[in-house]
């Protein structure tokens, strides 16, 4: 799978789930389940409910994503 197939959307964390998984409401209104990317996990970046995040998604499964950035 080529990296160009992925696309990024912005959203807000609305719920924290087990195993560093979060429920994120995207700016278009959809709610997806997202996990933290490896670099964020390695650098111990904490994500709390209400944080603005960027979610990287693949067109193959639009219900799951990967959190790649947390806005301050």
UniProtKB/Swiss-Prot annotation:
Component of the 30S ribosomal translation pre-initiation complex which assembles on the 30S ribosome in the order IF-2 and IF-3, IF-1 and N-formylmethionyl-tRNA(fMet); mRNA recruitment can occur at any time during PIC assembly. Gene3D superfamilies: Nucleic acid-binding proteins. Coiled coil: none annotated. GO terms for cellular component: cytosol. Its main location: cytoplasm. Belongs to the IF-1 family. The keyword Cytoplasm applies. GO terms for molecular function: ribosome binding; rRNA binding; translation initiation factor activity. This is Translation initiation factor IF-1. Residues 1-72 form the S1-like domain. PANTHER family: TRANSLATION INITIATION FACTOR IF-1, CHLOROPLASTIC. Keywords: Cytoplasm, Initiation factor, Protein biosynthesis, RNA-binding, rRNA-binding. It comes from Saccharophagus degradans (strain 2-40 / ATCC 43961 / DSM 17024). It is found in: Cytoplasm. It comes from the Bacteria. One of the essential components for the initiation of protein synthesis. Stabilizes the binding of IF-2 and IF-3 on the 30S subunit to which N-formylmethionyl-tRNA(fMet) subsequently binds. Helps modulate mRNA selection, yielding the 30S pre-initiation complex (PIC). Upon addition of the 50S ribosomal subunit IF-1, IF-2 and IF-3 are released leaving the mature 70S translation initiation complex. Pfam families: eIF-1a (PF01176).
């Amino acid at each position: 799978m080529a990296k160009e197939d992925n696309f990024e959307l912005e959203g807000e964390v609305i719920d924290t789930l087990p195993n560093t998984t979060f429920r994120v409401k995207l700016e278009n209104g959809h709610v997806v389940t997202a996990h933290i990317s490896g670099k964020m996990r390695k650098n111990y970046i904490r994500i709390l409910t209400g944080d603005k995040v960027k979610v990287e998604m693949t067109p193959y499964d639009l219900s799951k994503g990967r959190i790649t950035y947390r806005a301050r």
